[in-house]
């Protein structure tokens, strides 16, 4: 295992242990994070997002990760998050593909990809099934996620 594979492993092990501080230590101060739920987050927003998600999960979040691969500049991993979605209390099993870029021994860019329609069907039931594939619905979810993060950052 090289140092960047060890860094990815450290990140997801901390995530599985609900350790937001250690997760944050894996990121470069100028980190960019992108995913379908939040869109683009930068710098301290990224660590605050993970902290918020861990607090909202109230210990009911299961993280599994696999296929950790990295070289000197890029890396990837697959991970699965199992939790109850806070707005509906519906069980979600989200399968995510992550890509990383490294700088100065830390993660400078983190991109998570997942099937938004599949996620929305689990999180919202029939509404997600009918509307989850639409750009309108996806933008609404993203807007609500960003609003929750902004409120959390004020605390």
What kind of region is each of these model predictions?
Residues 21-22, 29-75:
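A solvent-exposed, acidic/Ser-Thr-rich amphipathic alpha-helical stretch
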Residues 11-15, 27, 33, 38, ...:
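Aromatic side chains
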Residues 8-11, 23-24, 31, 46, ...:
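Hydrophobic pocket/interface hotspot
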Residues 3, 45, 92:
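Soluble or luminal CAZymes and related metallo-dependent hydrolases
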Residues 1-17, 21, 25, 29, ...:
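Short, low-complexity N-terminal intrinsically disordered segments enriched in polar/charged residues
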Residues 54-64, 69-155:
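A beta-strand edge to alpha-helix "cap/lid" segment located at domain peripheries
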Residues 7, 45-46, 116, 137:
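Alpha-helical structural motif
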């Amino acid at each position: 295992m090289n140092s960047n594979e060890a860094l990815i492993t450290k990140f997801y092990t901390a995530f599985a242990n609900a350790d937001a501080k250690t997760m944050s230590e894996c990121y470069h101060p100028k980190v960019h994070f992108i995913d379908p739920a939040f869109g683009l987050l930068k710098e301290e927003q990224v660590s605050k997002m993970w902290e918020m998600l861990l607090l909202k999960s109230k210990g009911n979040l299961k993280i599994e990760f696999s296929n950790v691969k990295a070289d000197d500049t890029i890396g990837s991993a697959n991970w699965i998050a199992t939790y109850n979605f806070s707005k509906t209390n519906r069980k979600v099993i989200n399968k995510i593909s992550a890509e990383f870029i490294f700088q100065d021994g830390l993660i400078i860019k983190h991109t998570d990809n997942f099937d938004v329609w599949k996620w929305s069907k689990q999180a919202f039931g029939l509404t997600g099934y009918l509307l989850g594939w639409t750009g309108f619905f996806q933008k609404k979810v993203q807007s609500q996620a960003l609003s929750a993060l902004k409120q959390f950052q004020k605390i």
